Amino acid sequence: MLNLRAVMELLTIEKAQDYGLTLPETGQRDQVLHDALVGYLANSRSGTRATKTKATVKASGKKPWRQKGTGRARAGYVSSPVWVGGGVVFGPQPRDFSKNIPKKIKGLALLKAFAAKVRSEEVYCLEKVEMTEIKTKKMLSLLEGWDGKESGLLILKNPSRNVLLSGRNIPHLGIVRAQDVNALDLLGFKKVFLERPAIEVLVERVKKFKREKSQNENGGTR
């Protein structure tokens, strides 16, 4: 059991509203969150399966023997698919798994994922994280009460080099900029640790999406 309340503040729905962030109800727009996660996971895939065709097999282009007079079947090249060691016909080739995720879907999914973590009481606020030297031990002291058995995501406004290097040796801990965090990042970790300056960035990202959404809706009704 985590005992984070002594050193960190639990972010509740009411406190999120104090920052100007209104969280959606549970069950609303779950399909949007699903679509975004499928897109993020698909974009992380790389098609690596590949077979060599007769054009890519390393072999001589010389005709194995003359066309007539040998009594054997005619052959033009040793990389022919009918020969052992030749190319493969219609074999698997690398494919592009990437999906285009609309900006609106990204914004809604981020809001949904953040709301889910807040309602589950898995988001904690802490003061600005600063490191004057690279020390893993000091990084752990900032997260005092976190036993490390459950994965944790530290969201910072502008993580310094010392912070990144101090945290990369800690198992199950991820560090990401508030400007770059997405729904997959939030749901991929059990606990979320939010630096207070990062909350403002996160709220501004959501507000920006809401402004664009309202402008599009108003423009569409004219």
Swiss-Prot record:
A Gene Ontology biological process term: translation
Reported function: One of the primary rRNA binding proteins, this protein initially binds near the 5'-end of the 23S rRNA. It is important during the early stages of 50S assembly. It makes multiple contacts with different domains of the 23S rRNA in the assembled 50S subunit and ribosome.
Source organism superkingdom: Bacteria
Keywords assigned by UniProt, alphabetized: Ribonucleoprotein, Ribosomal protein, RNA-binding, rRNA-binding
Subunit: Part of the 50S ribosomal subunit.
Gene: rplD
Pfam families attached to this UniProt entry: Ribosomal_L4 (PF00573)
Gene Ontology terms, MF aspect: rRNA binding; structural constituent of ribosome
PANTHER family reported in the protein's UniProt record: 50S RIBOSOMAL PROTEIN L4, LARGE RIBOSOMAL SUBUNIT PROTEIN UL4M
Protein name per Swiss-Prot or TrEMBL: Large ribosomal subunit protein uL4
InterPro entries: Ribosomal_uL4, Ribosomal_uL4-like, Ribosomal_uL4_dom_sf
Gene3D superfamilies hit by this protein: 3.40.1370.10
Family from the record: Belongs to the universal ribosomal protein uL4 family.
Residues annotated as signal peptide: none
Organism in which the protein naturally occurs: Methylacidiphilum infernorum (isolate V4) (Methylokorus infernorum (strain V4))
Gene Ontology CC: one annotated term: ribonucleoprotein complex
